[in-house]
Protein backbone atom coordinates (compact mmCIF):
# COMPACT_ATOMS: atom_id res chain seq x y z
CA UNK A 1 0.00 0.00 0.00
CA UNK A 2 2.88 2.36 0.77
CA UNK A 3 4.39 1.71 -2.64
CA UNK A 4 1.06 2.40 -4.33
CA UNK A 5 0.77 5.65 -2.37
CA UNK A 6 4.28 6.72 -3.38
CA UNK A 7 3.89 5.75 -7.04
CA UNK A 8 0.54 7.50 -7.25
CA UNK A 9 1.95 10.70 -5.74
CA UNK A 10 4.85 10.75 -8.21
CA UNK A 11 2.64 9.92 -11.20
CA UNK A 12 0.12 12.59 -10.19
CA UNK A 13 2.77 15.27 -9.71
CA UNK A 14 4.30 14.38 -13.09
CA UNK A 15 0.93 14.46 -14.81
CA UNK A 16 0.03 17.82 -13.28
CA UNK A 17 3.22 19.32 -14.75
CA UNK A 18 2.45 17.80 -18.15
CA UNK A 19 -1.09 19.19 -18.11
CA UNK A 20 0.34 22.62 -17.35
CA UNK A 21 2.65 22.67 -20.41
CA UNK A 22 0.81 20.56 -22.96
CA UNK A 23 3.09 19.24 -25.68
CA UNK A 24 5.61 22.10 -25.64
CA UNK A 25 8.34 20.07 -23.88
CA UNK A 26 8.88 16.68 -22.25
CA UNK A 27 8.81 16.42 -18.47
CA UNK A 28 11.65 14.26 -17.13
CA UNK A 29 12.76 13.16 -13.72
CA UNK A 30 16.34 13.47 -12.55
CA UNK A 31 18.70 10.97 -10.95
CA UNK A 32 17.64 12.32 -7.52
CA UNK A 33 15.64 9.44 -6.16
CA UNK A 34 15.16 7.78 -2.79
CA UNK A 35 17.86 5.13 -2.21
CA UNK A 36 16.76 1.66 -3.37
CA UNK A 37 13.56 3.04 -4.92
CA UNK A 38 14.97 4.40 -8.20
CA UNK A 39 13.36 1.79 -10.45
CA UNK A 40 9.90 2.17 -8.94
CA UNK A 41 10.10 5.98 -8.84
CA UNK A 42 11.18 6.22 -12.47
CA UNK A 43 8.38 3.81 -13.40
CA UNK A 44 5.92 6.12 -11.62
CA UNK A 45 7.15 9.07 -13.70
CA UNK A 46 6.38 7.07 -16.85
CA UNK A 47 2.92 6.21 -15.50
CA UNK A 48 2.30 9.94 -15.10
CA UNK A 49 3.28 10.59 -18.72
CA UNK A 50 6.85 11.76 -18.10
CA UNK A 51 10.08 10.37 -19.44
CA UNK A 52 13.30 8.92 -18.07
CA UNK A 53 16.23 10.00 -20.16
CA UNK A 54 18.93 9.10 -17.64
CA UNK A 55 18.65 6.15 -15.33
CA UNK A 56 21.94 6.84 -13.59
CA UNK A 57 25.32 8.45 -14.21
CA UNK A 58 26.64 5.43 -16.14
CA UNK A 59 24.13 6.04 -18.96
CA UNK A 60 25.92 9.08 -20.29
CA UNK A 61 28.57 11.60 -19.45
CA UNK A 62 27.13 14.41 -17.37
CA UNK A 63 29.46 17.37 -16.96
CA UNK A 64 28.12 19.45 -14.08
CA UNK A 65 29.05 22.58 -12.19
CA UNK A 66 31.24 20.76 -9.68
CA UNK A 67 33.37 19.41 -12.56
CA UNK A 68 33.54 22.85 -14.14
CA UNK A 69 34.74 24.38 -10.87
CA UNK A 70 37.87 22.23 -11.06
CA UNK A 71 38.74 22.75 -14.73
CA UNK A 72 38.01 24.59 -17.96
CA UNK A 73 34.59 23.67 -19.40
CA UNK A 74 35.77 23.42 -23.00
CA UNK A 75 38.66 21.13 -22.02
CA UNK A 76 36.31 18.90 -19.99
CA UNK A 77 33.93 18.54 -22.93
CA UNK A 78 36.80 17.78 -25.32
CA UNK A 79 38.07 15.06 -22.96
CA UNK A 80 34.61 13.52 -22.67
CA UNK A 81 34.34 13.47 -26.47
CA UNK A 82 37.61 11.51 -26.68
CA UNK A 83 36.35 8.84 -24.27
CA UNK A 84 32.61 8.78 -24.97
CA UNK A 85 32.53 5.30 -26.59
CA UNK A 86 29.04 5.74 -28.01
CA UNK A 87 27.58 7.37 -24.91
CA UNK A 88 25.78 10.68 -24.96
CA UNK A 89 27.36 13.73 -23.38
CA UNK A 90 25.28 16.28 -21.48
CA UNK A 91 26.91 19.54 -20.47
CA UNK A 92 25.44 21.73 -17.74
CA UNK A 93 25.73 25.48 -18.19
CA UNK A 94 24.48 28.19 -15.88
CA UNK A 95 25.23 31.19 -18.05
CA UNK A 96 25.41 32.14 -21.72
CA UNK A 97 29.19 32.61 -21.70
CA UNK A 98 29.65 28.96 -20.74
CA UNK A 99 27.34 27.94 -23.57
CA UNK A 100 29.16 30.08 -26.12
CA UNK A 101 32.50 28.56 -25.10
CA UNK A 102 31.38 25.06 -26.10
CA UNK A 103 29.20 25.71 -29.15
CA UNK A 104 30.37 23.62 -32.09
CA UNK A 105 31.80 20.78 -29.98
CA UNK A 106 30.45 17.26 -30.53
CA UNK A 107 28.19 16.60 -27.55
CA UNK A 108 24.51 15.72 -27.27
CA UNK A 109 22.64 17.93 -24.81
CA UNK A 110 22.92 21.32 -23.17
CA UNK A 111 21.49 21.32 -19.65
CA UNK A 112 20.54 24.87 -18.64
CA UNK A 113 20.69 25.02 -14.86
CA UNK A 114 18.87 27.66 -12.83
CA UNK A 115 18.79 30.17 -15.66
CA UNK A 116 16.36 33.05 -15.90
CA UNK A 117 13.59 32.70 -18.47
CA UNK A 118 15.19 35.46 -20.54
CA UNK A 119 18.61 33.76 -20.63
CA UNK A 120 17.06 30.33 -21.11
CA UNK A 121 15.22 31.59 -24.17
CA UNK A 122 18.46 33.06 -25.58
CA UNK A 123 20.36 29.87 -24.78
CA UNK A 124 17.78 27.67 -26.49
CA UNK A 125 17.97 29.91 -29.55
CA UNK A 126 21.77 29.52 -29.68
CA UNK A 127 21.84 25.77 -28.99
CA UNK A 128 18.72 24.40 -30.68
CA UNK A 129 20.33 24.05 -34.10
CA UNK A 130 23.02 21.75 -32.76
CA UNK A 131 21.95 20.13 -29.51
CA UNK A 132 19.05 18.79 -27.51
CA UNK A 133 18.13 21.27 -24.80
CA UNK A 134 17.11 20.65 -21.22
CA UNK A 135 16.13 23.03 -18.43
CA UNK A 136 16.57 22.17 -14.78
CA UNK A 137 16.71 23.82 -11.40
CA UNK A 138 13.91 25.19 -9.23
CA UNK A 139 11.18 24.28 -11.68
CA UNK A 140 7.73 24.23 -10.11
CA UNK A 141 4.11 23.99 -11.21
CA UNK A 142 4.04 27.81 -11.10
CA UNK A 143 6.89 28.41 -13.56
CA UNK A 144 6.95 25.25 -15.69
CA UNK A 145 4.82 26.77 -18.47
CA UNK A 146 7.15 29.77 -18.78
CA UNK A 147 10.09 27.38 -19.03
CA UNK A 148 8.32 25.30 -21.69
CA UNK A 149 7.53 28.40 -23.76
CA UNK A 150 11.27 29.03 -24.20
CA UNK A 151 11.35 26.14 -26.68
CA UNK A 152 13.45 23.82 -24.52
CA UNK A 153 13.14 20.13 -25.50
CA UNK A 154 13.05 18.70 -21.98
CA UNK A 155 12.35 19.97 -18.50
CA UNK A 156 13.86 17.91 -15.71
CA UNK A 157 12.24 18.25 -12.32
CA UNK A 158 13.96 16.68 -9.33
CA UNK A 159 11.03 17.30 -7.01
CA UNK A 160 8.93 14.79 -8.97
CA UNK A 161 10.82 11.99 -7.26
CA UNK A 162 12.51 13.43 -4.20
CA UNK A 163 9.64 15.58 -2.90
CA UNK A 164 6.38 14.16 -4.21
CA UNK A 165 3.70 13.66 -1.59
CA UNK A 166 2.35 10.16 -1.28
CA UNK A 167 -1.34 9.83 -2.08
CA UNK A 168 -3.57 8.95 0.84
CA UNK A 169 -4.82 5.40 0.39
CA UNK A 170 -6.35 3.03 2.87
CA UNK A 171 -7.16 -0.63 2.73
CA UNK A 172 -10.32 -1.89 4.36
CA UNK A 173 -10.88 -5.55 4.90
Which stretches of residues belong to each language-model region?
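Acidic/glycine-rich phosphate/pyrophosphate-binding loops and surrounding catalytic core
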Residues: 1-105, 109, 118-126, 130-135, ...
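Cys/His-rich Zn2+-binding cysteine-cluster or related metal-binding knuckle/ribbon modules and their
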Residues: 141
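Active-site loop ensemble at the mouth of alpha/beta enzyme cores that anchors a bound cofactor
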Residues: 170-173
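Short secondary-structure boundary segments
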Residues: 114, 137, 159
